[in-house]
Regions:
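Cysteine-centered motifs
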Residues: 5-6
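Gly/Ser/Thr-enriched, mixed-charge loops and adjacent short helices
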Residues: 120-241
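An N-terminal, well-structured beta->alpha segment
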Residues: 9-76, 82-83, 157-182
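N-terminal small/polar loop signature for handling phosphorylated ligands or for N-terminal nucleophile
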Residues: 53, 58-121, 169-170, 199-259
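Proline/glycine-rich low-complexity loops and linkers
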Residues: 90, 140-169, 173, 261-334, ...
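Phosphate-binding and adjacent anionic-ligand microenvironments
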Residues: 283-442, 447-476
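Glycine-rich phosphate-binding loop
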Residues: 107-119, 238-260, 265, 309-311, ...
Length: 476
């Protein structure tokens, strides 16, 4: 079918594009001030040109449940068609379902999503020729968009496709539960609510649903399970009913939160211990990739299960790229992105990770006891230090240069992503965020005293390079 007429979008070409929307792993901004139909149209044309240059003729387009998704989708699709692309419009889906389409229907795709950002945000996550694009590739798109350096071509067209049935069948055909489980699922009014509860029921679970209605106003709580305040309703439902476990999803369904019957939040680095043990039972010696924010307890757990632990840079695109290089069967980030290559496609998917978790825990009579028994330490939540634009990377370079003269044995210095210093009883991390102008701090100690000592040592170093540093809780 032909694309809808978009003459109104063409009039927007005089509007300058805000450089702030081009992030390390995606394009993201506030609607309509920095992200609007004009930007979406230009992105469609620029991405379409890059796709054709890579030999990609077909691009899937999906969108989450945000209020601005429909208008941005229309403009993006028009831009892709202008570039000569065949667009497969898969409608309102989770980000992992867009990735699924880009693995099964074609090799490239764009998801319109604001992820876990406030409701007036939206953005674009992109896959080109089977790879999540990031960094320089996003900057190349920016250059094409700013210069309007595209060629309009004929031959573009749009068709609709529904991937839901194929996606559900693929998961239900892969995951088998040893027994039915009773769970509570909190989708936070994000797009996962449209599919995740039904998938869990298809696996044999008894599901109590919280906030499954897709509503871009997010009227109940923000869809970000990495923040404890967003898990209160889930914990209350668990403790007032007879469910065994609670699962929570972020706004676009690519991250998973887990809560035990007694209200304990099982953070992603501890989830990875369980997933690694399971995956390595079938892929002995496999490389398990995780980011620098993860617990010091994770590497020994991977080694004990017969795997090779590999610490890498934070960023879902970076973790996926590293996994592809080494054929790693599993990867994970402290932010909640879990990447299964074993039995799956290697992309981050909160629903699929939840299903794999249930498969493991269905073998136990007391799932909460299994989760609570995973090794843990005393740790801080993610902390932020606000900086000027461009300052965080400069500061981390200074910290990396100073560290060898400040920290001595038995401290081990790691500079793969900022500065991480490991002691026998804990670690400290200071790194530059790739998405906002802040330093990201995280500390862990085997005891409260160790945590306190490590925090003080790392903060003392930070104050040498940024005397006005104010450490606060992370905000998204």
């Amino acid at each position: 079918m032909p694309a809808p007429c978009c003459s109104s979008y063409r009039k927007g070409f005089t509007v300058p594009i805000s450089p702030s929307i081009f992030k390390a792993y995606d394009i993201r901004g506030i609607v309509p001030s920095t992200l609007n139909e004009s930007v979406a149209l230009k992105l469609g044309r620029a991405f379409g040109q890059q796709a054709l240059a890579a030999g990609e003729m077909v691009v899937a387009v999906g969108r989450d449940g945000r209020l601005s998704g429909d208008e941005l989708s229309r403009a993006l699709i028009q831009g892709l068609v202008d570039a000569g692309i065949e667009v497969i419009d898969i409608g309102r889906v989770t980000t992992p379902m867009l990735y699924f389409a880009a693995n099964t229907l074609c090799h490239s795709g764009i998801q319109i999503t604001g992820s876990h950002n406030p409701k007036d945000y939206n953005g674009f996550k992109m896959v080109l020729a089977g790879r999540a694009i990031y960094g320089d590739e996003i900057q190349k798109l920016r250059q094409i968009m700013e210069k309007e350096a595209w060629r309009m071509q004929g031959g573009g067209k749009v068709r609709q496709a529904d991937v839901t049935q194929a996606y559900v069948e693929r998961i239900v055909g892969d995951v088998k539960l040893a027994r039915p489980m009773k769970i509570v699922v909190d989708s936070g009014n994000g797009i996962a609510g449209a599919t995740a509860p039904g998938i869990f029921r298809a696996l044999g679970c008894e599901v109590t649903e919280l906030f499954s209605e897709v509503d871009g106003n997010f009227p109940n709580h923000h869809p970000d399970p990495s923040k404890p305040e967003n898990l209160k309703d889930l914990i209350e439902a668990l403790q007032s009913g007879d469910a065994e476990l609670g699962l929570a999803f972020d706004g676009d369904g690519d991250r998973l939160g887990i809560v035990t019957k007694d209200g304990q939040n099982i953070f992603p680095d501890r989830q990875m211990m369980l997933f690694a043990q399971d995956v390595l039972s079938r892929v002995p010696g496999g490389e398990i990739v995780y980011d620098v924010k993860c617990s010091q307890r994770l590497a020994p757990a991977i080694e004990a299960a017969g795997g090779k632990p590999v610490m890498f840079k934070t960023g879902h695109s970076l973790i996926k790229a590293r996994m592809r290089e080494t054929n790693a069967p599993l990867g994970g980030e402290m932010s909640g992105h879990i990447f299964f290559k074993e039995r799956w496609f290697g992309f981050d998917d909160g629903t699929y990770a939840g299903c794999r978790l249930l498969e493991i825990l269905s073998r136990a009579q007391n799932p909460s006891a299994v989760l609570n028994a995973l090794p843990t330490s005393y740790s801080t939540p993610e902390l932020n230090v606000a900086c000027e634009e461009g300052e965080p990377h400069k500061l981390t370079a200074e910290l990396q240069a100073m560290a060898p003269s400040v920290f001595s044995e038995p401290a081990q210095i790691n500079t793969i992503d900022g500065l991480r210093v490991d002691w026998p009883d804990g670690f400290g991390l200071i790194r530059a965020s790739n998405t906002t102008p802040v330093l990201v701090l995280r500390f862990e100690g085997h005891t409260q005293a160790a945590l306190h000592r490590i925090q003080n040592e790392m903060k003392a170093l930070l104050l040498k390079v940024k005397p006005d540093a104010v450490v606060g809780s992370a905000a998204h």
